[in-house]
Amino acid sequence: MNTIHEFIHMKNGRWQHLDEVLPVIPSNVILNKTITGIGATYTEIKAERNSVIVEPNRPVIKGKCAQAKHKDDNLKGVYQGVYQKDIVKYLEKTKKNGKYIKIMTTPESFQKVIDALEEVDIDIRYDCFLLFDECEKITKDCDYRNDITLPMDLFFECQNKAMVSATPITDLSDPRFNSFKHIMIDPMDDYRIGLNLYTTNNVLQLAKEMMPELLGSEKPLFIFVNSTDMIDALMKKLELTELSAVFCSEKSVDKLKGIGFKRAYEDWDADKMMKINWMTSRFYSALDIELDEQPNVLMITDVFIAQWTMFDPFTDSVQVIGRFRNGISTFTHISNTDYHIPYHNRQFFRDKCNCDKEVYDMLNTMYIDAQNDEYRAAYYDVLQVLPYKKFLKEDGCVNYFKMDNYIDEEMTKVYYAEPNNLYNAYIGSEHFNVYHKNFLYKMGDYERLKIEDKSVSLKEKRKRIVEQLEMIGVAETEADMQYVRDLRAADSSIVDAYELLGKEQIEELRYSVTKIKEAMILKRYEGKISGRTVLELVNNAFHAGQWYSRKDIKDKLTEIYKTTETRSPNSVTSLTIFEFFNASVSDKRNSKGFYLISRKFEL
């Protein structure tokens, strides 16, 4: 792909507008505008030609259509809830008034636009300029938005077309881009933004410590987190709920309102802004947030909660800052890292895709040449689960955007393998002046994940808690004390046991719940044994609603009285249980015993 360079300068504190160096966007180009907010969509809206502009989501379109500067531009937004008949009505009115078509649509609503154009005898391939804005989203979102790539086949059929972004992905696999040119807008002045990159092994604790500084001024705080569950958890754990508003997708709005949080919105509106404003990836790109003040901006990543909370330093982070048209006060990214993520370069993932293709093609040939239906069915089943299958459309053709999405996601994960990887990625993006500091705590997010793992047994979970308590030792810092509180919230019984008995005795008791409770009772009453001590031990050993053999009852009661030295073991029989429980005689096969109905004494 050939690259053409155009240059822009800073004038009176603002960057030149795109149309000052590029009066119209040429066809068959990927335009890298480098600087957000220099008016690429504005340039196309004002261009004297019919335009269909594809935007990544609805808030962007609604925001552009509502701007006063476009009130005379005949702009029509198309998204869910706008119907083909509405578009046809707009097109007929546009023809009648002799105006240019200016449609902004989401990828999912693109087909409605095509059908409406055909209904009024307009062929987008020859009669309109088709522009994909924030074009990296096609690659980045296609793994969970299948319809985002639907317009692409028609895109290549259009005579007049282009893709634009401040952060385009230009290393594309689709051979149809080979004839495209790459226009690079080169700023001639320093355009880098200051970034505080704070890596840590404990995201929650670091966020807690940073909040007083971020909230200390009168400026609003915008926090970008691409997980509604994580936003909800952070609001609660950081005690920020009453200060917060959340801007997210329609489904996430319903989810938050369903659990009692009412200030959740699917569209940006400055009138709904609170002191703290949480935003998901829906608001990373294209949206214009125009405020009188310059806010503090924070991004939070937790690689152990979800991969999709990772910000790509080359795209996502650049786009986040670009939302604030009047600038920001501070920009901070708090993130943990995971050394378990393997390190590979981009070529490794491309080679893997090629290898996967060779395997798929070989088995597909065997499927086609199969000797009988049984063999063919077997090959078919194998083909469906091969890695390369996810890159194919229903018609068997390659969806190159899904392949690029895979490579892009794997590379983003590599950035989060260790702090220096993330720092170097930010430096490599050339958009930031980076101040990096690493904050380490005794216990972190990886250790917390081990406690929250629901796949392990209770015994294994308690082993992990004891190991972590041993690692903390004496809780000297607020972070240590908070982590112990978190462990107590996860399982207060084992934390109490550790504090009273210690790791060695718990291990000697092999993490037996009954034996640990018994040891704790004896420890508490050491040197001052009483009838209450005996009662606690009996209640710990026996439970109402269960059957016990006479032998087991006598043996356990004898052990209790011998340990506490409160009664001669020789005087104990199985009938002694009636001193503590209402019970009935109940024999099972060859074993005599009692069914314990209820306790006579509660502590």
Whereabouts are the PLM-identified features?
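Conserved Walker A/P-loop ATP-binding site and its immediately adjacent core
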Residues: T36, A40-Y83, E108, T170-L172, ...
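The feature captures the C-terminal accessory region of ATP-dependent helicases
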Residues: E44-A47, R350-L603
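Conserved strand-helix element at the start of the C-terminal RecA-like helicase core
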Residues: N50-K64, M104-T106, M210-E239
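Inter-Walker segment of RecA-like/P-loop motor cores
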Residues: K71-D115, I259-W268
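SF2 helicase catalytic motif II
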Residues: P107-F110, E118-F156, N160, V297
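Interdomain hinge/linker at the junction between the two RecA-like core domains of SF2 helicases
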Residues: A166-E213
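A short beta-strand element within the Helicase C-terminal
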Residues: I289-D302
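Conserved SF2 helicase motif VI
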Residues: F304-S329
